[in-house]
């Protein structure tokens, strides 16, 4: 999410520096946050993000043709999850518990998983004089950066939570209609606060802008009001990943199903997308929108609709021997390099049912054993049927991400995430074998 010419705060020197190293004295600060001693907000980076202002367009065609769609569908094209739940109550209730549904939410005591209790609410940075305190106040929750040398501080309120907490969370705040990322995140794998990925070591700043592409993968709907790139219309921001991100705009479908004359007809309703009926490539494209690694937008955000060709919207950088797919963010690229993928017709949904909360790794093994005989495993002779639940741990182990890192006082932290290139990982297999043998 970092912008290459963003400005950073160095509280130790009590100045701000741009990326070229120029020092700019702080003289004033005017915003909603709690401030002391004249801290000022760094100048906003003005990025050239062309075509980000949506305009009203006609009702989306049921064939989801991408030829002329250069703007996002209007809010009126979307029915909302509540409308879906009226007929799909069971699916809706299960889906509410999934990481996708909870991928973004308002910041509350329930949605923020990091601790605000004494002894667990302080993030020590690589700068011994700089800490970030997590503060619960009557009017909300705050991140407060403190210079211990002189007790000067800069604080902003948690407004939006990004991430269900399955792996971690990052937090955003509003300054009027401008959206920014906060400097402290929470990682579940080490159960603690960390400097947000990409932030410099020993520094804290509150000026990392949230661009439309960020929200395209972490929200259901928004209206960009760029420039600057982080200006959004607050009253129509829909958090979480809702039904219509994978099924397409649903207003026409709801109207169809509510019609007394054609309700529940046997004829396929072409006004809604059933991903299971898409071709293999289009199914993969639906996931690739947010799980294809390094991409460059071709068209404005939210113009992609389920059933579209992703290459009309994103320029996807293919993996190479020098740039293999990382375990974070490029699950599709990794899967496509797997022999299981190239020798079958599998898609993401072969193993993942996005309507229900993910199972643990052991529960995925039956998907593997639907194609592979357990006796064909090289560890079968030594371990027998004990390996029946260990397919994923051996062939899709948890690996350290090279793309998502945090600069801590202990050094660079790398979160562990599930690999999606299915292959033999000798070290992982040996670890599983030792565990099963009690070694």
Give residue ranges: language-model regions.
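Bacterial N-terminal signal peptides
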Residues: 43-54
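Intrinsic-disorder-associated, low-complexity terminal segments enriched in Asp/Asn/His/Tyr and depleted
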Residues: 10-13, 18, 22, 26, ...
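Primarily the internal scaffold of c-type cytochrome electron-transfer domains
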Residues: 60-75, 82, 90-162, 170-172, ...
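Extended acidic/polar, glycine-enriched regions
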Residues: 196-211, 220
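Bacterial N-terminal signal peptides that target proteins for export
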Residues: 32-44
């Amino acid at each position: 999410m970092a912008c290459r010419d963003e400005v950073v705060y160095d509280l130790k020197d009590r100045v701000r520096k741009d990326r070229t190293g120029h020092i700019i004295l702080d003289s004033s600060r005017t915003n909603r946050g709690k401030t002391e001693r004249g801290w000022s907000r760094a100048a906003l980076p003005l990025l050239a993000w062309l075509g980000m202002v949506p305009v009203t367009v006609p009702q989306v065609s049921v064939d989801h043709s991408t030829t002329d769609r250069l703007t996002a569908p209007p809010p009126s094209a979307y029915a909302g999850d509540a409308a879906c739940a009226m007929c799909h109550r069971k699916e809706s209730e299960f889906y509410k518990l999934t990481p996708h549904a909870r991928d973004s939410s308002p910041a509350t005591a329930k949605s923020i998983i990091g601790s605000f209790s004494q002894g667990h609410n302080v993030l020590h940075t690589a700068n011994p004089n700089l800490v970030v305190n997590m503060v619960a106040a009557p009017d909300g929750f705050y991140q407060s950066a403190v210079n211990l040398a002189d007790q000067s501080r800069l604080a902003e309120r948690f407004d939006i939570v990004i991430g269900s907490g399955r792996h971690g969370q990052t937090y955003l705040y509003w300054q009027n209609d401008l959206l920014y990322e906060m400097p402290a995140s929470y990682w579940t794998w080490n159960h603690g606060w960390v400097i947000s990925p990409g932030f410099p070591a020993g520094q804290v700043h509150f000026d990392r802008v949230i661009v439309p592409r960020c929200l395209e993968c972490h929200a259901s709907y928004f209206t960009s009001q760029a420039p600057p790139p982080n200006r959004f219309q607050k009253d129509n921001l829909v958090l979480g990943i809702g039904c219509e991100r994978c099924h397409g705009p649903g207003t026409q479908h709801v109207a169809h199903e509510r019609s007394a004359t054609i309700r529940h007809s046997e004829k396929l309703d072409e006004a809604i997308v059933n991903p299971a009926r898409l071709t293999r490539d289009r199914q993969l494209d639906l996931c690739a929108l947010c799980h294809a690694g390094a991409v460059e937008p071709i068209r404005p955000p939210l113009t992609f609709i389920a059933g579209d060709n992703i290459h009309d919207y994103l320029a996807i950088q293919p993996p190479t021997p020098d740039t293999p797919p990382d375990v974070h963010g490029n699950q599709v690229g990794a899967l496509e390099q797997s022999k299981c993928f190239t020798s079958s017709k599998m898609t993401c949904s072969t193993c993942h049912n996005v309507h229900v909360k993910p199972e643990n790794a052991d529960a995925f093994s039956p998907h593997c054993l639907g194609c592979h005989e357990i006796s064909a495993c090289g560890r079968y002779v030594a371990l027998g049927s004990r390996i029946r639940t260990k397919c994923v741990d051996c062939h899709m182990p948890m690996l350290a991400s090279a793309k998502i890192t945090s600069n801590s006082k202990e050094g660079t932290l790398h979160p562990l995430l599930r690999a999606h290139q299915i292959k033999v990982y000798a070290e992982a297999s040996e670890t599983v074998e030792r565990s099963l043998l009690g070694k």
